[in-house]
């Protein structure tokens, strides 16, 4: 069996968490220390009370989440209500909690953005940077595709409830992809640079920009755009350490 801190050390190095220190609101790495020996690992996008209950029923003692429960910006001011219940169940059941946020969006092998491009059979040609850190990708269709065909693929392979904002060309070639809450990054582009911008959730001011710049937008859904990294992580750990892993799906819609 692998020890907890062996797992933490491997993931911290593999996902290169130190370089995201300045820009990530989430505390990456080990957030809550549980048992020292890893018996069964679950991955998830966010930790709800239902996810914790499922982990307890499944004998999970390490929970790896994309959205951690400890943030730099907000901090923990009060431990009350549903948050208190979360912590109580985690601590009483000696579950370790690890979080990997931007490192798992950006990773060049198992990250959310790379995975979305692969699922849609797109060729990555460039990276989208924030403070010299790659947080998204620009990808190319082999042939200029109908925007409606791309949208159909997204609905089929990522989220049937994805939304198309058709403000640009009927046929698209260059596609920018940023999973999660990446709306603001559309303002890095003009219609001459990308034909389609894809992200997890969108904002009104960014929609105005898309209209004025005539850039198509597909809103994939925040949750749906971020299941890939944690799923890939579960598979990686299973293959590398021969430990039992499972992906826990949430009832989240947005």
Question: Positions of the model-derived regions?
Answer:
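Active-site catalytic microenvironments in core metabolic enzymes, especially phosphate/sugar-handling
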Residues: 1-254
């Amino acid at each position: 069996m692998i020890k907890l801190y062996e797992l933490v050390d491997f993931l911290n190095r593999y996902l290169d968490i130190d370089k995201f220190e300045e820009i990530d609101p989430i505390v990456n790495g080990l957030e809550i220390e549980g048992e020292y020996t890893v018996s069964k690992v679950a991955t998830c996008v966010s930790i709800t009370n239902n996810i914790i209950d499922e982990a307890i029923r499944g004998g999970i003692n390490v929970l790896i989440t994309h959205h951690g429960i400890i943030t730099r910006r907000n901090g923990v001011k009060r431990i009350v209500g549903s948050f208190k219940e979360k912590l109580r169940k985690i601590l009483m059941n000696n579950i370790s909690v690890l979080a990997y946020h931007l490192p798992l969006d950006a990773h060049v092998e198992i990250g959310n953005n790379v995975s979305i491009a692969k699922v849609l059979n797109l060729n990555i040609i460039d990276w989208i940077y924030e403070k010299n850190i790659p947080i998204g990708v620009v990808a190319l269709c082999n042939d200029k595709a109908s925007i409606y065909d791309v949208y159909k693929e997204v609905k089929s392979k990522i989220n049937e409830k994805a939304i198309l904002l058709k403000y640009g060309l009927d046929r698209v070639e260059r596609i920018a992809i940023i999973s999660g809450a990446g709306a603001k990054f559309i303002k890095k582009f003009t219609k001459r640079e990308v034909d389609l911008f894809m992200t997890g959730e969108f904002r009104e001011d960014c929609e105005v920009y898309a209209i004025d710049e005539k850039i198509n937008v597909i809103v994939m859904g925040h949750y749906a755009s971020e299941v890939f990294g944690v799923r890939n992580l579960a598979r990686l750990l299973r293959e590398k350490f021969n430990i039992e892993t499972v992906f826990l799906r949430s009832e989240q819609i947005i």
